[in-house]
């Protein structure tokens, strides 16, 4: 799908522009994003960020705390939903234009060709993934039961089933690692 020299040169003029939608997304989702704060069940006020929300999802035994962190984090993204959508549309339009210019039948074919993956292989992977969700659904059902939750949401999937809350300092861990490899 390589074009003649004149056409390749013409396409190269657009290469800097092609990164604009991704750049807009990155600036909006990192530099310009302003998360709010929540009050946890302990009474502590916490400033939400991606990292803090992840910490709450993975460590808070309180379902309502995890839910509040999820809602606050997602509402921040929802506040800019149209800008995110426009950025994604720009990415789709860019990929479509390049696929058309290089005579691909679809953007999927153009994207997969870089890794030499046939479209049929990719579509089969999706089909098999969809067909094989029953074990994952069962796993989450068992987690819900083990955690004794009335409702189970995505933000409940990171909390350990076993209530184990022990922290180790660096020196203690270093000593344990050294002791564990002594026999080697």
What is each residue range found by the language model?
Residues 1-120, 124, 128, 171, ...:
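His/Asp/Glu-rich acidic catalytic environments and adjacent acidic regulatory segments
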Residues 118, 140-184:
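A conserved glycine-rich
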Residues 123-138, 155:
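Long, non-coiled-coil amphipathic alpha-helical linker/lever segments
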